[in-house]
Amino acid sequence: MNDLQKYLSTAPVLLTLWMTFTAGFIIEINRFFPDMLGLYF
């Protein structure tokens, strides 16, 4: 169990989980509010 916890706390795993969450969040925001990203640039 300690090895699994150490593996899940490594940088590539955390980066993958964070990027997946961020991409999903942006996709959902664009689903409810389309073309909002174009207003900021």
Curated annotation (Swiss-Prot):
Coiled coil: none annotated. InterPro entries: PSI_PsaJ (IPR002615), PSI_PsaJ_sf (IPR036062). One of its GO terms (biological process) is photosynthesis. It holds the Pfam family PSI_PsaJ. Keywords: Chloroplast, Membrane, Photosynthesis, Photosystem I, Plastid, Thylakoid, Transmembrane, Transmembrane helix. The chain crosses the membrane at residues 7-27. GO terms for cellular component: chloroplast thylakoid membrane; photosystem I. It comes from the Eukaryota. It is a single-pass membrane protein. It is found in: Plastid, Chloroplast thylakoid membrane. May help in the organization of the PsaE and PsaF subunits. Belongs to the PsaJ family. This is Photosystem I reaction center subunit IX. It comes from Trieres chinensis (Marine centric diatom).
